[in-house]
């Protein structure tokens, strides 16, 4: 049985910027990508990433405490992938990640 490679797009959502990383599961390689400004062009810019990398899966980090604006914006971003593009999204608990 051969192992099939998957491409994963990881997002560190923020109300001003969204951190982005791409990963390949077969080799375990990861690559940070340029930060996306979270403005009116955010979904257009995310679409460009999708066209370039064609990920199989999207990971979105979920922080332990969120403001209402943060929660609403993150929900819109998740819905963009799930409802608009029919992509699988996994939310990752950030409770025990480091803080800067």
Where in the sequence are the language-model features?
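Phosphate- and other anionic-substrate recognition elements at nucleic-acid/protein interfaces
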Residues: 2-11, 15-100
